[in-house]
Design a protein with these regions (language model features):
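Repetitive helical segments and hydrophobic/amphipathic motifs
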Residues: 11-15
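Outer-membrane beta-barrel proteins
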Residues: 2-8, 18-139
């Protein structure tokens, strides 16, 4: 069921976005440790990560991001994908909402999903996320 929902979200976003007006971006990083929400994801070892994004003039976007991980349970890769909509109003207020899936190939029990809403103005911003399929406690 999850894969069907993911496919539907990507299909909707990709059909609504003209490839001629789309902006493609990529990124890569080498870090001394991958820390997420205050916890190491690589057992305090180096991480290599990278991703690809596509965004349309309409504000629709989707992308993917990956990194090595080390939890001691067989998971070696985190593969995230996301889709959303972002815009800035004439008064300078910006907003962003979307869906984010964290997946761990070979360790499906670690997979989880979030929806998020971000609001910003000038140099200030706030993002609220809510888990849709919460990850297990990794303390």
């Amino acid at each position: 069921m999850k894969n069907l929902i993911k496919f539907g979200v990507v299909a909707i976003f990709s059909s609504a976005m003209s490839l001629q007006s789309a902006e493609f971006e990529s990124n890569v990083a080498l870090s001394s440790d991958y820390i997420w929400r205050g916890m190491t994801q690589t057992a305090e070892e180096p991480a290599i990560s990278g991703g690809f994004d596509i965004a349309g003039e309409s504000g629709l976007y989707f992308g993917t991001w990956a990194s090595n991980v080390e939890f001691g349970d067989g998971a070696a890769l985190e593969l995230d994908w996301y889709a959303g909509y972002a815009n800035e109003l004439e008064n300078g207020v910006s907003y962003d909402f979307g869906y984010l899936a964290y997946t761990y190939p070979g360790e499906d029990s670690l997979d989880f999903e979030e929806i998020y809403l971000g609001l910003g103005y000038s140099y200030f911003g706030y993002t609220f996320s809510s888990g849709q399929d919460d990850a297990p406690d990794n303390s």
